[in-house]
């Protein structure tokens, strides 16, 4: 009875193994079809993730260990012929199972994900917008307007121009000659007198302050007893008119120059000469270029002074003729003077302004009286001529 039980055990495994292999083949085919379908679905969609693919690949269940156990069962020796035949059939089944296709393993059916792991690229900083870049450039640029505001404000323009200063000095001289009094005695009258001759609108206080400063400037210039050197002709004109108003240096202001010249013992001159003689010769050699430059400057100053003096003379002549028109016209009536003295009329015209103002006034009044007398005489003469002609006409008519 024992051999029969053994033969049953040997006969059962081949049938079981063949059915299992067939099931495995069918499952493998189904899995291949399913895999192909999944690949087609992935190609169509292209958006499936790794999480969706992992459960699908976990379906195949391989029951390979059962066949391995059947193959690896030890064969016991059979003592009967039946056992030998059975053994032969068992060996045949084993041979058939050996010749059959190997059962697929679970690793053969695992689907590897095709999705490549993207390398984490470092995020680049976003490019700045053009508006932000322009704003930053605008911040970096220096603000010229702010720098200009920080600068110190421009100096205010001077109220008194050189022409107005000169006109003020001329007005003082004219006012003194016409009114015979100082402008400071009646500033209201002088303000009305001078305001039409100035370009700027000034008040009485501004005029008095300017006169005071001009006088102070003149006295400072003549303090050393020497005439200062001017770079502009206008400054020299102002100085000359100031001299005519407030006096020459050394006369009314006690200049050093006149005091030195008037000294009886001449000590001041000697001290100056001693200083000059005590200077070393080397310093004299070194100072030659300076002396040349100084000499050139003095020559230029002399030329400027001559030109300015000519302008002063011309200006004085025009002012004199405007103040005393009868004196100027009197030269034209002196026709006989040119025959007696050819250069007499031109000489009088050039030097007429040198006459003192009080004497010029007297001459002007005399010429005016003479013109009035001449006019009255002309009327008498015309009346006499008319009477003479009337008598002649009446005589011719026989009356």
UniProtKB/Swiss-Prot annotation:
Residues 1-160, 250-301 are annotated as: Disordered. Residues 143-152, 270-299 have a biased composition (Basic and acidic residues). Its main location: nucleus. Residues 69-79 have a biased composition (Polar residues). Keywords: Nucleus, Transcription, Transcription regulation. Expressed in tubers and in leaves treated with sucrose. The keyword Transcription regulation applies. GO terms for cellular component: nucleus. Residues 20-54 have a biased composition (Acidic residues). The keyword Nucleus applies. Residues 80-100, 116-125 have a biased composition (Low complexity). GO terms for biological process: regulation of DNA-templated transcription. It is found in: Nucleus. It comes from the Eukaryota. Belongs to the GeBP family. May act as a transcriptional regulator. Binds specifically to the B-box motif, a promoter element that is required for the tuber-specific and sucrose inducible expression of the patatin gene. This is STOREKEEPER protein. The lineage of its organism: Eukaryota, Viridiplantae, Streptophyta, Embryophyta, Tracheophyta. The gene is STK.
């Amino acid at each position: 009875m024992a051999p029969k039980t053994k033969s049953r055990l040997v006969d059962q495994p081949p049938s079981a193994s063949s059915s299992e292999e067939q099931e495995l083949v069918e499952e493998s085919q189904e899995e291949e079809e399913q895999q192909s379908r999944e690949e087609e679905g992935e190609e169509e969609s292209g958006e499936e993730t790794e999480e969706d693919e992992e459960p699908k690949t976990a379906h195949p269940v391989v029951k390979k260990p059962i066949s391995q156990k059947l193959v690896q069962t030890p064969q016991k020796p059979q003592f009967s012929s039946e056992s030998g035949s059975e053994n032969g059939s068992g060996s045949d089944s084993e041979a058939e199972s050996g010749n059959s296709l190997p059962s697929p393993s679970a690793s053969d059916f695992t689907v590897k994900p095709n999705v490549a792991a993207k390398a984490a690229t470092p995020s680049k900083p976003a490019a700045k917008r053009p508006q932000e870049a322009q704003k930053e450039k605008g911040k970096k640029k220096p603000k010229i307007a702010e720098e200009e505001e920080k600068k110190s404000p421009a100096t205010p323009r001077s109220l008194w121009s050189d022409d107005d200063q000169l006109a003020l000095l001329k007005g003082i001289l004219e006012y003194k000659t016409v009114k015979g009094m100082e402008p400071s005695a009646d500033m209201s009258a002088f303000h009305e007198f001078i305001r039409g001759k100035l370009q700027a609108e000034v008040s009485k206080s501004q005029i008095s302050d300017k006169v005071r400063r001009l006088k102070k400037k003149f006295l400072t210039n003549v303090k050393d007893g020497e005439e200062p050197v001017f770079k502009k002709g206008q400054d020299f004109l102002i100085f000359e008119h100031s001299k005519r108003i407030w006096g020459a240096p050394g006369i009314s202001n006690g200049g050093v120059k006149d005091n030195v010249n008037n000294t009886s013992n001449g000590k001041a001159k000697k001290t100056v000469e001693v200083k000059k003689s005590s200077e070393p010769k080397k310093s004299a050699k070194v100072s030659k270029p300076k002396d040349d430059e100084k000499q050139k400057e003095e020559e230029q100053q002399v030329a400027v002074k001559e030109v300015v003096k000519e302008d002063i003379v011309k200006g004085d002549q025009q002012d004199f003729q405007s103040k005393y028109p009868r004196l100027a016209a009197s030269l034209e009536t002196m026709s006989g003077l040119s025959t007696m003295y050819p250069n007499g009329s031109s000489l009088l015209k050039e030097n007429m302004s040198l006459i003192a103002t009080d004497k010029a006034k007297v001459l002007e009044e005399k010429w005016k009286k003479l013109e009035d007398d001449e006019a009255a005489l002309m009327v008498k003469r015309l009346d006499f001529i008319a009477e003479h002609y009337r008598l002649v006409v009446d005589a011719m008519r026989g009356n």
